[in-house]
Amino acid sequence: MRFLLRLPQIHFRKLSCSMSVLMGSKQFLEFCLLPSFASYPSSPSYSSSRQVSSVSRRFRPVLASRPVSKNSPYYQRTNGLSSYNSIPRVPTPVDTEVEADKRVVLSRLVTLRRKLAEQGVDAENCPPGQHSGLICPTCEGGNSGEKSLSLFIAPDGSSATWNCFRGKCGLKGGVRADGGLASADPIEKVERKITVEGIELEPLCDEIQDYFAARAISRKTLERNRVMQKRIGDEIVIAFTYWQRGELVSCKYRSLTKMFFQERKTRRILYGLDDIEKTSEVIIVEGEIDKLAMEEAGFLNCVSVPDGAPAKVSSKEIPSEDKDTKYKFLWNCNDYLKKASRIVIATDGDGPGQAMAEEIARRLGKERCWRVKWPKKSEDEHFKDANEVLMSKGPHLLKEAILDAEPYPILGLFSFKDFFDEIDAYYDRTHGHEYGVSTGWKNLDNLYSVVPGELTVVTGIPNSGKSEWIDAMLCNLNHSVGWKFALCSMENKVRDHARKLLEKHIKKPFFDADYGRSVQRMSVEEKDEGKKWLNDTFYPIRCEMDSLPSIDWVLERAKAAVLRYGIRGLVIDPYNELDHQRTPRQTETEYVSQMLTKIKRFSQHHSCHVWFVAHPKQLQHWDGGAPNLYDISGSAHFINKCDNGIIVHRNRDENAGPLDLVQIGVRKVRNKVAGQIGDAYLCYDRTTGSYSDSPVTPGMPERRSPKRY
């Protein structure tokens, strides 16, 4: 009892006792079981026997899992009651307040990291309560790409602060998870006022002048640009002084071992800034010595950037002026640069130099920028910069390189010079098919030939043979130049389409049917040989889904056929079998225009000719004549946007000529090299589905549309 009184919180899960003792000690039972039965209602239904039964189940003797030492505090002897107990195995109590605090911290961290990401700081792997080194989103760690940004996240995730320790950047700011963004602007620096005497500059000694002489820089140029020197211990370094309107604002030092450093807390400007104050043409180079080299070639209107080039072009948008710390020198010199109508960028020819050129052009406007291409040093190598050209080839070649500067490339804007090689190849006909490929019929070749990369729209009244004529022409193209084709023919079953193509290829009917007349059908051997040809020449595009295919779906499969099989032609037959879902506010005319633009881009990009079959609308008062292209159902864009427009019309009037006569009306030819407007007549062989030149050219009436104003 004394043991129980001392440890009232312990639950005895393994208790060895005598039931008789328990039954005989009513007070003991009431004392032990009071906490367990406190929740039961005091009702007669809960009898004493039921209580004892419950107690016996709870205090059922259980063998100990391991011996318990007699010295253990859990081993006690009482009057007539011997008991021992192992360490209780109960779950650790969960502190709900601690768990709630953890959830709050995690929620803050999610919010905080999202806000940091908006500032360009990736803090996904930065734990709270520690300082983490990251790439600065503003200066990107300079040329070396060092992790110069120190980020600290509060242990409770409530806030974060950052600071870039690079002197040229100084980005500093902070953000709170539950509040606004603290200032992330660069630290406001107080610009130092410096003088030649104050920073202890002195005239150049003979040794430094000899160094410049070896680099083809004259003493006169050094004096005009006020190049000086400074003694640091036992070493002499070159001092490039930065002046603005006669005031010394900064100084950059260069050791003979090519180590650079600048005066701290000074204004960053272009080197030689006063030389471009009254000029409309500016040359920008990458180093101070290159600026001096330009002067030796006769160009005084030249400036140099004060810092090294970046490793690569930034993929981010140009930041605002107050945040563009890496290129602050351009903003500081904007009053000078905005007057220039022509800016020649002559940075180094290596990767970082070209990246610097791109960053400068992005900020100053590419439309007024030109770029310099340095001359060749050898068969496989170009000179790197202006001073290297001056030292190796002299001032005349350097001047020539600057005068030959080319307009800076602008996406989507070209000069014809960019295409001279292509024009020469077109003139020499080195690519092939410049005149177009023969259709296989002499009567038609004078009017229409197949040019890679063009779109031909084919129309005609139903059952006039549009698909038959296209299939026959594809067979001719394969036989003559070996072209392959993708067929999106949605009105034909695959087996029927295969039969038609095999008949045209083998020149025999597929079946012993009435249409074959007395011509013997193709043999099994001929069929098997034709199947191989069929498999090597044509690639069906079939939509096996319940829905109709869209034009995007068809062009994606056609692109795959170009890359996988090398097709040179695509047939889309017909237009009205495609899925033409469009936005509620889009008219059919707008949709057709957009669709034809997609087809033409595919055709031109992959140098693949596309035949697009479009049915005419219902003809009113049709007199048996051929329709025209404006009769195509849907939009006038079918004729406006296509390169070639063709009408296929079959004669059904015995008085007008033979019934096997087919009129091929060429109604539009954009490329005069490929053909001209006119009519050609072919004879159709119903047995094999093939066409041949007709010896007669009868006049067949053409349906006229009302005059359009």
UniProtKB/Swiss-Prot annotation:
Q: Which residues take part in binding ATP?
A: G460, I461, P462, N463, S464, G465, K466, S467
Stretches assigned to the SF4 helicase domain: 430-698
SMART domains membership: TOPRIM
Reaction(s) this enzyme catalyzes, per UniProt: ATP + H2O = ADP + phosphate + H(+)
InterPro entries in alphabetical order = DNA_helicase_DnaB-like_C, P-loop_NTPase, TOPRIM_DnaG/twinkle, TOPRIM_dom, Twinkle-like
Task: Give the chief site where it resides.
Answer: plastid
Q: Does the keyword ATP-binding apply?
A: yes
The residues covered by the Toprim domain are: 280-385
A cellular component term, taken from the record's GO annotations: mitochondrion
Task: Show the transit peptide stretch.
Answer: 1-16
Q: Summarize where Mg(2+) 2 binds, as residue positions.
A: D348, D350
Keywords of this entry: ATP-binding, Chloroplast, DNA replication, DNA-binding, Helicase, Hydrolase, Magnesium, Metal-binding, Mitochondrion, Nucleotide-binding, Nucleotidyltransferase, Plastid, Primosome, Transferase, Transit peptide
Q: Can the keyword Nucleotide-binding be found in this entry's annotation?
A: yes
Q: Report, as the record phrases it, the tissue specificity of this protein.
A: Expressed in young leaves and shoot apex tissues. Detected in developing tissues such as cotyledons, sepals, pistils and inflorescences. Nearly undetectable in mature leaves.
What does the UniProt record say this protein does?
Has both DNA primase and DNA helicase activities and may be involved in organelle DNA replication. Capable of producing RNA primers of 9 to 18 bases from a single-stranded DNA template.
The entry's protein name is Twinkle homolog protein, chloroplastic/mitochondrial
